[in-house]
Amino acid sequence: MTFTCKALLCLGMTLGLWITVLTEFLPRPILRVQPDTVVSTQSKVIFFCERSQGAELYCLYKKGNPRNPRCKEIRPKPGKKVEFFISKIEPYHAGHYHCYYQIHGQWSEDSDALELVVTGVYDYNELRLSVLPSPVVTVGRNMTLHCISHSHYDKFILTKEDHKFTSSLDTQCIPPSGQCQALFVMGPMTSNHTGTFRCYGYYKHTPQLWSIPSEPLEIHISGLSKKPSLLTHQGHILDPGVNLTLQCCSDINYDRFALYKVGGVDIMQHTSQQTDTGFSMTNFTLGYVHHSTGGQYRCYGAHNLSSEWSASSDPLDILITGPIQMSTLPPITSMPPDQLESYVNALIGVSVAFLVFLFILIFIILQRRHQRKFRKDGEEAQKEKELQYPTGAVEPISRDRDQQKRSNAAAATQEESVYASVEDMETEDGVELDTWKPPEGDPQGETYAQVKPSRLRRVEAIIPSAMSREQLNTKYEQAEEGQEVDGQATESEEPQDVTYAQLCSRTLRQGTAAPPLSQAGEAPEEPSVYAALATACPGAVPKDKEQ
């Protein structure tokens, strides 16, 4: 019994080692796809799983779903490969694929992953691809491919027609325009960069689902071979409607020539014609010219067996006469949707800015009108206040004559300004009368008088707005007789003295008039002081009182 158990154990170990060795020697299959790993929706795809001779069963599965493989059995003739068809590609077909096979009941390892990308999933916004400085680049220099879209994709990817060149970049969104872009810098340029390029957009969470492609952009590399010549027989300055033909020729036997307009995208290529003199040439007929035909042109030569073009010809400028077009925008009906959207957005932005500016302007005008009206009302109120002062009331008088407002222009021409300021003094017995000449800039030659009594507590000044000379003379005569001024000064019940200043001329004369004696022959406590300017009133102050 013990011997039987040992024999069975040895047999099992031997079979296990043999199976392990057999599995290790089964090579990995190779998985391929046609027409390409990047396909558009609704297209047909064929997967090929290949291995060495003798496989009996092949299986294909998508990563993430290994339990539901698609398997094909090869009988009665085992072969090297098997085909798996997908008649119509849908977005859910995108992903990573593997295949494996079986020989004598043993399974091989999985093939390397094959990524299938489905394009055309997002078609709501078209992408645009452009190149700087031009689609024809001199060998050894750099160029920049610019991919832009209104959709906020996470990444843009740039591909060549054979998908041998693939590069992806994160998008950069421009807030004012709402566009996203990516700049692909390429260089130094070689002949391997010649070809047709496209760009796509996709999101990070679905990297195998791409947008519709941009329009194809052809890139050509110009080399160091001899440049051709570009000529025109119609001249450089043309009228609209003239039929224009450009001729490109060279003494090198180029197989074809290409014509490129600087700043454009399209490149015209024609087969060259050999002349008896050994020149190669071709004609590019541009048809009847219009304003968009004007610009700068260059031509290149190329051989059929080389993807590299010659050096650029000297530039040829074509000018079109006629009136200058004020607007270069195409009609709205002929704009593509993306350009129409940009145009509408720009128009809305300009309109909003204009309305905001108009609102601010109206606000400023209304505010200034309100301030002017408020100032005018204040001036009228001030005039009314000045006119409402009763006789004998104190009216504040400004020293600045230029700022005084008069209610009656006729009276203003008859009166002369009088300025009097009365200040308290520290001493109780002193009386001062200060006079000074008017400023040189005063056109009316006004005279100022400042009277400073010692015990003044309150000042009452009566200054008429317009006073005739007869009235002034009467006032002075009364002042000489001591009937009015002295009576008011002696009979005042309040503890204050009243001082009067009368100015009626440009010459200041100062006098002290003694008040009349009382019945007992006693003088009052303090005399009154008079100051007068009187050229027209010489008798206002008695001569015996002058100093």
Swiss-Prot record:
Pfam families (alphabetical):
Ig_2
Q: The motif ITIM motif 2: which residues?
A: 446-451
Extent of the signal sequence:
1-23
Region described as Disordered: 377-450, 468-498
* Gene3D superfamilies, sorted: Immunoglobulins
Extracellular face residues:
24-345
Q: How does it sit in the membrane?
A: Single-pass type I membrane protein
* Residue spans of biased composition, Basic and acidic residues class: 377-387
Mind telling me which InterPro entries this protein's record contains? Ig-like_dom_sf (IPR036179), Ig-like_fold (IPR013783), Ig-like_Receptors_ImmuneReg (IPR050412), Ig_sub (IPR003599)
Q: Where is this motif: ITIM motif 4?
A: 528-533
What keyword terms does UniProt attach to this protein? Cell membrane, Disulfide bond, Glycoprotein, Immunoglobulin domain, Membrane, Repeat, Signal, Transmembrane, Transmembrane helix
Q: Where is this motif: ITIM motif 3?
A: 498-503
Q: Kindly list the places in or outside the cell where this protein is found, as annotated in its UniProt entry.
A: Cell membrane
User: Domain comment, in the record's words?
Assistant: Contains 4 copies of a cytoplasmic motif that is referred to as the immunoreceptor tyrosine-based inhibitor motif (ITIM). This motif is involved in modulation of cellular responses. The phosphorylated ITIM motif can bind the SH2 domain of several SH2-containing phosphatases.
Q: What is this protein called?
A: Neutrophil immunoglobulin-like receptor 1
